[in-house]
A protein has these predicted regions:
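Terminal, non-globular segments
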Residues: 1-172
Length: 172
């Protein structure tokens, strides 16, 4: 088993796993529509980008995030560039938080996630509704923001475990 832990394939796979998860989630439009749950949705991509650009920005590059936004726009059918713009705003906020934070704190990160997602969704709604005149359901955005905020602790634990494994494999 120890030979598997020292495998070069495993090191490479783990180092690219956040990027793989990002592109997998934007290609699939990760949601729960197939469960026929009307008022349940969360934005996995926002959680992924927020965590990795805040805790380990070397694992998820800004160019990959930009292209993931372009792909997301094509998949969901909104004008190209809106998701990329919102994802890069998310990256900017996390870079700012990372630079002003002396010691990482889960609760502060969680609250800043809520404020950041509210900002991003507000910008996206304004662009879609006022600029492109696309009908937007405000309730869905509010529900999505709430569930994304509530699911952050679960995904934080998963991403933190993954981050430790990646750091262990790279430093080994």
């Amino acid at each position: 088993m120890s030979s598997l832990n020292k495998s070069p394939f495993l090191k490479i796979f783990l180092s690219y796993l956040p990027v793989i998860m990002l592109f997998f989630s934007v290609f699939n439009e990760f949601d729960f529509n197939y469960l026929k749950l009307d008022y349940f949705s969360f934005n996995f991509v926002h959680l992924l980008i927020f965590f990795w650009t805040l805790r380990n920005p070397d694992q998820l590059g800004y160019l990959a995030i930009f292209f993931a936004g372009i792909i997301n726009d094509v998949v969901i059918g909104v004008p190209i560039g809106i998701s990329s713009f919102c994802y890069l705003i998310l990256c900017s906020v996390t870079a700012y938080i990372r630079n002003i934070t002396l010691s990482p704190n889960f609760m502060k990160d969680w609250i800043s996630l809520l404020l950041t997602i509210l900002l991003i969704n507000s910008i996206q709604v304004i662009i879609l509704d006022l600029v492109f005149l696309i009908k937007v359901d405000y309730t869905n955005y509010l529900i999505n923001t709430g569930f994304t905020f509530l699911f952050y602790p679960i995904f934080f634990l998963f991403f933190n475990f993954l981050n430790e494994r990646i750091s262990y494999q790279i430093n080994d």
